[in-house]
Amino acid sequence: MEYFNVGKIVNTQGLQGEMRVLSVSDFAEERFKKGSQLALFDDKDRFVQEVTIVSHRKQKHFDIIKFKDMYHINAIEKYKGYTLKVSKDNQGDLQEGEFYYHQIIGMAVYEKDVLIGHVKEILQPGANDVWVVKRQGKRDLLLPYIPPVVLSVDVPNKRVDVELMEGLDDED
Protein backbone atom coordinates (compact mmCIF):
# COMPACT_ATOMS: atom_id res chain seq x y z
CA MET A 1 0.00 0.00 0.00
CA GLU A 2 1.20 3.52 -0.79
CA TYR A 3 1.43 6.06 2.07
CA PHE A 4 2.04 9.81 2.16
CA ASN A 5 3.63 11.80 4.98
CA VAL A 6 1.25 14.13 6.87
CA GLY A 7 3.18 14.93 10.05
CA LYS A 8 5.77 14.08 12.66
CA ILE A 9 5.14 13.44 16.35
CA VAL A 10 7.55 15.81 18.07
CA ASN A 11 6.47 15.43 21.70
CA THR A 12 3.77 14.45 24.14
CA GLN A 13 1.26 17.03 25.41
CA GLY A 14 0.14 16.61 29.00
CA LEU A 15 -0.57 13.30 30.72
CA GLN A 16 -3.79 12.22 28.96
CA GLY A 17 -2.28 10.74 25.78
CA GLU A 18 -2.17 13.82 23.57
CA MET A 19 0.67 14.25 21.08
CA ARG A 20 2.19 17.35 19.56
CA VAL A 21 2.44 16.96 15.78
CA LEU A 22 4.32 19.11 13.30
CA SER A 23 2.02 18.88 10.29
CA VAL A 24 3.21 18.71 6.70
CA SER A 25 -0.31 18.02 5.46
CA ASP A 26 -1.92 20.16 2.83
CA PHE A 27 -5.31 19.67 4.55
CA ALA A 28 -4.50 19.42 8.28
CA GLU A 29 -8.06 20.10 9.51
CA GLU A 30 -9.39 17.29 7.33
CA ARG A 31 -6.43 14.97 7.88
CA PHE A 32 -6.50 15.11 11.70
CA LYS A 33 -10.27 15.28 12.26
CA LYS A 34 -11.97 12.86 14.64
CA GLY A 35 -12.30 9.41 13.06
CA SER A 36 -9.45 9.85 10.57
CA GLN A 37 -7.36 6.75 9.91
CA LEU A 38 -3.58 7.24 9.80
CA ALA A 39 -0.55 4.98 9.93
CA LEU A 40 2.41 5.24 12.31
CA PHE A 41 5.92 4.74 10.91
CA ASP A 42 9.01 4.51 13.12
CA ASP A 43 12.22 6.53 12.75
CA LYS A 44 13.50 3.98 10.19
CA ASP A 45 10.32 4.46 8.10
CA ARG A 46 8.92 1.03 8.99
CA PHE A 47 5.17 0.59 9.34
CA VAL A 48 4.16 0.21 13.01
CA GLN A 49 0.35 0.27 13.14
CA GLU A 50 -2.87 1.92 11.97
CA VAL A 51 -4.34 4.52 14.35
CA THR A 52 -7.66 6.37 14.61
CA ILE A 53 -7.83 9.99 15.76
CA VAL A 54 -10.30 10.73 18.57
CA SER A 55 -9.47 14.41 19.11
CA HIS A 56 -7.66 17.25 17.38
CA ARG A 57 -6.95 20.90 18.15
CA LYS A 58 -4.48 23.54 17.03
CA GLN A 59 -1.98 25.07 19.45
CA LYS A 60 0.44 27.63 18.05
CA HIS A 61 2.28 25.91 15.17
CA PHE A 62 1.33 22.39 16.24
CA ASP A 63 -1.59 20.03 15.83
CA ILE A 64 -2.47 18.35 19.12
CA ILE A 65 -4.00 14.92 18.52
CA LYS A 66 -5.06 11.88 20.50
CA PHE A 67 -5.42 8.30 19.24
CA LYS A 68 -8.13 5.78 20.07
CA ASP A 69 -7.14 3.43 22.93
CA MET A 70 -4.06 5.50 23.87
CA TYR A 71 -5.20 7.62 26.79
CA HIS A 72 -2.07 8.01 28.91
CA ILE A 73 1.39 9.44 28.41
CA ASN A 74 2.94 6.00 29.05
CA ALA A 75 1.08 4.58 26.04
CA ILE A 76 2.37 7.21 23.61
CA GLU A 77 5.80 8.31 24.78
CA LYS A 78 7.50 5.68 22.62
CA TYR A 79 6.04 7.32 19.48
CA LYS A 80 8.04 10.56 19.79
CA GLY A 81 9.90 11.05 16.51
CA TYR A 82 7.54 8.78 14.58
CA THR A 83 5.92 9.84 11.33
CA LEU A 84 2.20 9.92 10.61
CA LYS A 85 1.12 8.93 7.12
CA VAL A 86 -2.14 8.61 5.25
CA SER A 87 -2.81 5.75 2.87
CA LYS A 88 -3.62 6.56 -0.73
CA ASP A 89 -7.11 5.07 -0.14
CA ASN A 90 -7.78 7.53 2.74
CA GLN A 91 -6.60 10.69 1.01
CA GLY A 92 -10.06 11.84 0.00
CA ASP A 93 -11.28 13.65 -3.08
CA LEU A 94 -10.06 17.05 -4.24
CA GLN A 95 -11.93 20.00 -5.68
CA GLU A 96 -11.03 21.45 -9.07
CA GLY A 97 -7.71 23.30 -8.81
CA GLU A 98 -6.65 21.52 -5.59
CA PHE A 99 -3.61 19.27 -5.42
CA TYR A 100 -1.81 17.14 -2.88
CA TYR A 101 1.69 18.28 -1.98
CA HIS A 102 3.19 15.01 -3.18
CA GLN A 103 1.71 15.71 -6.63
CA ILE A 104 3.34 19.17 -6.84
CA ILE A 105 6.77 18.43 -5.34
CA GLY A 106 9.16 17.47 -8.12
CA MET A 107 7.15 19.15 -10.89
CA ALA A 108 9.03 21.05 -13.59
CA VAL A 109 8.33 24.81 -13.59
CA TYR A 110 8.34 26.68 -16.91
CA GLU A 111 8.01 30.31 -17.94
CA LYS A 112 7.27 30.73 -21.66
CA ASP A 113 8.45 27.15 -22.31
CA VAL A 114 11.83 27.80 -20.63
CA LEU A 115 12.58 25.49 -17.69
CA ILE A 116 13.09 27.51 -14.49
CA GLY A 117 13.54 24.60 -12.08
CA HIS A 118 11.62 22.02 -10.04
CA VAL A 119 9.33 22.42 -7.03
CA LYS A 120 11.26 21.09 -4.03
CA GLU A 121 9.09 22.20 -1.11
CA ILE A 122 5.79 23.90 -0.28
CA LEU A 123 5.57 26.50 2.49
CA GLN A 124 2.42 27.76 4.22
CA PRO A 125 3.37 31.21 5.53
CA GLY A 126 -0.09 32.77 5.44
CA ALA A 127 -2.92 33.44 3.02
CA ASN A 128 -1.49 31.33 0.18
CA ASP A 129 1.05 28.57 -0.30
CA VAL A 130 4.55 29.40 -1.52
CA TRP A 131 6.30 26.89 -3.76
CA VAL A 132 10.08 26.69 -3.38
CA VAL A 133 11.61 26.14 -6.82
CA LYS A 134 15.15 24.71 -6.97
CA ARG A 135 17.07 26.26 -9.86
CA GLN A 136 20.34 25.29 -11.53
CA GLY A 137 23.16 27.67 -10.53
CA LYS A 138 20.82 30.16 -8.81
CA ARG A 139 19.21 30.59 -5.42
CA ASP A 140 15.85 28.95 -4.83
CA LEU A 141 12.88 30.89 -6.16
CA LEU A 142 9.92 31.53 -3.85
CA LEU A 143 6.82 31.27 -6.01
CA PRO A 144 3.45 32.33 -4.53
CA TYR A 145 0.60 30.04 -5.53
CA ILE A 146 -1.71 32.77 -6.84
CA PRO A 147 -3.56 33.01 -10.18
CA PRO A 148 -1.48 35.80 -11.79
CA VAL A 149 1.72 33.78 -11.18
CA VAL A 150 0.72 30.11 -11.56
CA LEU A 151 -1.00 29.87 -14.94
CA SER A 152 -1.51 26.10 -15.15
CA VAL A 153 -0.72 22.90 -13.30
CA ASP A 154 -0.57 19.71 -15.39
CA VAL A 155 -0.40 16.86 -12.86
CA PRO A 156 -0.17 13.96 -15.37
CA ASN A 157 2.75 15.61 -17.19
CA LYS A 158 4.32 17.00 -13.96
CA ARG A 159 4.48 20.51 -15.43
CA VAL A 160 3.69 23.96 -14.02
CA ASP A 161 3.50 27.03 -16.23
CA VAL A 162 4.09 30.40 -14.58
CA GLU A 163 4.45 34.07 -15.34
CA LEU A 164 6.92 35.70 -12.98
CA MET A 165 5.73 39.07 -11.73
CA GLU A 166 8.27 41.86 -11.53
CA GLY A 167 10.34 41.54 -8.36
CA LEU A 168 9.77 37.80 -7.83
CA ASP A 169 13.14 36.80 -9.28
CA ASP A 170 15.77 38.94 -7.59
CA GLU A 171 18.54 37.37 -9.70
CA ASP A 172 17.34 38.84 -13.01
Swiss-Prot record:
GO molecular-function terms, A-Z: ribosome binding
The answer to whether the entry has keyword Lyase is: no
- What are its GO biological-process terms? ribosomal small subunit biogenesis; rRNA processing
Gene3D superfamilies for the chain: PRC-barrel domain, RimM
Q: Which intervals hold domain PRC barrel?
A: 96-168
Please name the Pfam families in this protein's record. PRC, RimM
Q: What GO cellular component term, any one, is given?
A: ribosome
* Record bears the keyword Magnesium: no
Tell me where on the tree of life, at the top rank, the source sits. Answer: Bacteria
Q: Which InterPro entries match?
A: PRC-brl_dom, PRC_barrel-like_sf, RimM, RimM_N, RimM_N_sf, Transl_B-barrel_sf
Could you tell me where this protein is found in the cell?
Cytoplasm
Question: What keywords appear on the UniProt entry?
Answer: Chaperone, Cytoplasm, Ribosome biogenesis, rRNA processing
Free-text function comment from the UniProt entry:
An accessory protein needed during the final step in the assembly of 30S ribosomal subunit, possibly for assembly of the head region. Essential for efficient processing of 16S rRNA. May be needed both before and after RbfA during the maturation of 16S rRNA. It has affinity for free ribosomal 30S subunits but not for 70S ribosomes.
What family, per the record?
A: Belongs to the RimM family.
Q: What is known of its domains?
A: The PRC barrel domain binds ribosomal protein uS19.
Q: How does it assemble?
A: Binds ribosomal protein uS19.
Q: What is this protein called?
A: Ribosome maturation factor RimM
Taxonomic classification: Bacteria, Bacillati, Bacillota, Bacilli, Lactobacillales
